[in-house]
Amino acid sequence: MATSEAPLLKRTAATLSDDMAVNYKLLHSPKFRALVVENVLSVTAFAFMARQTESLAGPEMETLNNCGVNGCGFTSFYQFKGVVGVYAAFWVYTVLLIGLYLFSRGPPPGTEFVVHALFTLCMIAFVSLSVISCTSTVIESDYSVCKNAAYAKASLVFAALVVVLNCATCAFVFKQWRSLQFVGMPENFRPFGRHRHKHGHHAGDADDAIPTHP
């Protein structure tokens, strides 16, 4: 009984070991390295903005007075709070994604592209609004909201770098998804999907069948 169980235990342990093995080859992938850089830049972006608890001028003179002599913090501006929220959420996402990739459990290209694209759109929106707010002048023509807010200005620089890297990552993931014939996307939404259907494409054709899962 014991002798028959020993090989089974060894096979089970070997299977678990293979499943939990770290994919070290992935460390040399440009896509993985870009993801790590995005992770570092995103945590830097929201950390700097979150540290801006004073020195911001209000969009109106009354706001400046209400914040006192030390000025406003980032919480007085929904744009800056949006930067903190979006980039903090993206940092958590990149941490999870890095962990999945290390153990060869990455999401399908379609899922990764959609999530990255949505994050990028939110980033572009809040960064653009923050830059507009940051450069707005109050009281005097040469006194901007972020004139004395070094952390906020640094945060927006790092945030913009993340947007650039995200756009490059989206392009790379989209190419991967396209090479898999947009697997997971409904037929009617695929490029040329309706055209192929009109010309006699059948789901039962083995040569033309598109898998629904990677």
Curated annotation (Swiss-Prot):
Alphabetized UniProt keyword annotations: Cell membrane, Membrane, Transmembrane, Transmembrane helix
Native organism: Ostreococcus tauri
Cytoplasmic side: 1-82, 134-153
An example Gene Ontology CC term for this record: plasma membrane
Subcellular location per the Swiss-Prot or TrEMBL entry: Cell membrane
Membrane topology category: Multi-pass membrane protein
Extracellular topology ranges: 104-112, 175-214
Family from the record: Belongs to the Casparian strip membrane proteins (CASP) family.
Subunit structure of this chain's protein: Homodimer and heterodimers.
Primary localization: membrane
Region annotated Disordered, chain positions: 194-214
Residue spans crossing the bilayer: 83-103, 113-133, 154-174
Protein name: CASP-like protein 0U1
Domain of life: Eukaryota
